[in-house]
Amino acid sequence: MSVEVANETEWQLDPKVFSELGLWVMHQMRVSTQSELTITFVDPEPIAELHERWMDLQGPTDVMSFPMDELRPGDERNEPEGMLGDIVICPWVAQQQAQAAGHSTMEEMMLLTIHGVLHLLGYDHHTREQERQMFGLQRQLLLTFFALHHGTAWSATLPSGSVNELEVYERKYGTNRELGH
């Protein structure tokens, strides 16, 4: 398994944390050791363009997933091989959601990483039952990962004097956007 992490923002975050999280979730979901995943952190404008192009929804969103080989979770006998796909995360939207939820931006981005992997594996939340199953699983995975790394301090910060790219986007295009995944 391999996880490549790219940070195209000013946010200072440790790519190793997201690589380790991605690998761990893939292992928990029994994805083949030959599978690959890419996680990219972007500013509001690039994710808004992807959001409109692929979902026909305006404005930036928190996370988008782009499956490649349409893998599904494996079992003891079968671990499907292939390119899992790409996850794109906007730290600016994650920050806003984290503030509303009362936890850190880093925790929100880790949750979004798990959410993205589950989408790549075919999970969705169109119905209440799907939402209950997917959100329950992502919470269980996140809490287990935290428990395994008890005492580890993770952070995602901005350099002093950084411009709030979400505010820049909203001034430029307005605030009419649909948050969510």
Swiss-Prot record:
GO terms for molecular function: metalloendopeptidase activity; RNA endonuclease activity; zinc ion binding. Its main location: cytoplasm. One of its GO terms (cellular component) is cytoplasm. This is Endoribonuclease YbeY. Its cofactor is Zn(2+). Zn(2+) binds at H115, H119, H125. PROSITE patterns: UPF0054. Belongs to the endoribonuclease YbeY family. It is found in: Cytoplasm. InterPro entries: MetalPrtase_cat_dom_sf_prd, YbeY, YbeY_CS. Pfam families: YbeY (PF02130). Gene3D superfamilies: Metalloproteases ('zincins'), catalytic domain. Single strand-specific metallo-endoribonuclease involved in late-stage 70S ribosome quality control and in maturation of the 3' terminus of the 16S rRNA. The keyword Calcium does not apply. One of its GO terms (biological process) is rRNA processing. Its EC number is 3.1.-.-. Keywords: Cytoplasm, Endonuclease, Hydrolase, Metal-binding, Nuclease, Ribosome biogenesis, rRNA processing, Zinc. Binds 1 zinc ion.
